[in-house]
């Protein structure tokens, strides 16, 4: 065995990711030209994750449902309640922070052509259409609502199949999981490429003009990750929540921060759930579902940026209206999940509830894209790490009750 292989076997994946992160920063500062050329490493890694995620979810969920025995329990309902509670709590935190530290934007015109939803009804219609999408189309376009619908439907149908068929489905699930593990082993190289190229191309100059807005956004996300989420987990498991919280942030949040896609981070969360010894019938459904509907980070982004526009335009808004807006916007945000920067497209919808015209709302979206290097990364890290955190909390709480 070569010294390199021995080193890789001895050090944990997280340590290797941190080394890749530091090496990426160093390369971007010392040799920006080389760093820009290494962007393909990050692109290959993210593409591999995105390629494997829909297949993984489809096979895992189908196998889980098909092999579910009558009398076995899944804990999806309490996890769904945790997702909703976490998103609502994040929205409230964002509203309070925006009221205490109002941000003002230097709004400029945006040349980007974005297709934002026209209203809440349209978003809900799109979600329903996603659920009844062609299964091949859903897999090709990583439409996770459609993938979940077909996986659950086929899983239920295969419950009545012979034992041999169900064994084949289970073996397929094991095979896909093995491929995912191989992809995840390349995370340090992928993150090295992502960090070095992003810093070399954007630099930090683009962020300096929006430091206050970024401070409010990142501050809210840190508060939710380190205070609100642990409080919710403590209420659920009745013991110190921080070991589990920090583990999820370290193992899931770091990779999500750099891939900037909840969908791409699904394989990482599934692998972490397996290592934590969680209930497979539960996490194989709740993790991909969380990547679609658990949008605490999106709730913060939509609320803070919308209220920044509100403050800039001098519109008066009372607290209940602001909370209601952020909850409605966060619920709608699931329509743009799994896409890097997806939550920004919901800002025009949120702004319309305050009577802010689309032209100005699109300028706010442009501001969002300028700070997106940090905003979208932090948002995805919060969203994705919360998926596995709440799944683990619900499973552990159930185990404690069962003794």
From Swiss-Prot:
<feature type="transmembrane region" description="Helical">
    <location>
        <begin position="79"/>
        <end position="99"/>
    </location>
</feature>
<dbReference type="GO" id="GO:0032329">
    <property type="term" value="P:serine transport"/>
</dbReference>
<keyword id="KW-1133">Transmembrane helix</keyword>
<dbReference type="Pfam" id="PF00375">
    <property type="entry name" value="SDF"/>
</dbReference>
<protein>
    <recommendedName>
        <fullName>Serine/threonine transporter SstT</fullName>
    </recommendedName>
</protein>
<feature type="transmembrane region" description="Helical">
    <location>
        <begin position="138"/>
        <end position="158"/>
    </location>
</feature>
<dbReference type="GO" id="GO:0005886">
    <property type="term" value="C:plasma membrane"/>
</dbReference>
<keyword id="KW-0769">Symport</keyword>
<dbReference type="InterPro" id="IPR036458">
    <property type="entry name" value="Na:dicarbo_symporter_sf"/>
</dbReference>
<comment type="function">
    <text>Involved in the import of serine and threonine into the cell, with the concomitant import of sodium (symport system).</text>
</comment>
<keyword id="KW-0812">Transmembrane</keyword>
<comment type="similarity">
    <text>Belongs to the dicarboxylate/amino acid:cation symporter (DAACS) (TC 2.A.23) family.</text>
</comment>
<feature type="transmembrane region" description="Helical">
    <location>
        <begin position="353"/>
        <end position="373"/>
    </location>
</feature>
<feature type="transmembrane region" description="Helical">
    <location>
        <begin position="44"/>
        <end position="64"/>
    </location>
</feature>
<keyword id="KW-0472">Membrane</keyword>
<feature type="transmembrane region" description="Helical">
    <location>
        <begin position="295"/>
        <end position="315"/>
    </location>
</feature>
<dbReference type="InterPro" id="IPR023025">
    <property type="entry name" value="Ser_Thr_transp_SstT"/>
</dbReference>
<feature type="transmembrane region" description="Helical">
    <location>
        <begin position="327"/>
        <end position="347"/>
    </location>
</feature>
<keyword id="KW-1003">Cell membrane</keyword>
<feature type="transmembrane region" description="Helical">
    <location>
        <begin position="14"/>
        <end position="34"/>
    </location>
</feature>
<dbReference type="GO" id="GO:0015826">
    <property type="term" value="P:threonine transport"/>
</dbReference>
<dbReference type="GO" id="GO:0005295">
    <property type="term" value="F:neutral L-amino acid:sodium symporter activity"/>
</dbReference>
<keyword id="KW-0997">Cell inner membrane</keyword>
<keyword id="KW-0813">Transport</keyword>
<feature type="transmembrane region" description="Helical">
    <location>
        <begin position="214"/>
        <end position="234"/>
    </location>
</feature>
<feature type="transmembrane region" description="Helical">
    <location>
        <begin position="175"/>
        <end position="195"/>
    </location>
</feature>
<dbReference type="InterPro" id="IPR001991">
    <property type="entry name" value="Na-dicarboxylate_symporter"/>
</dbReference>
<keyword id="KW-0029">Amino-acid transport</keyword>
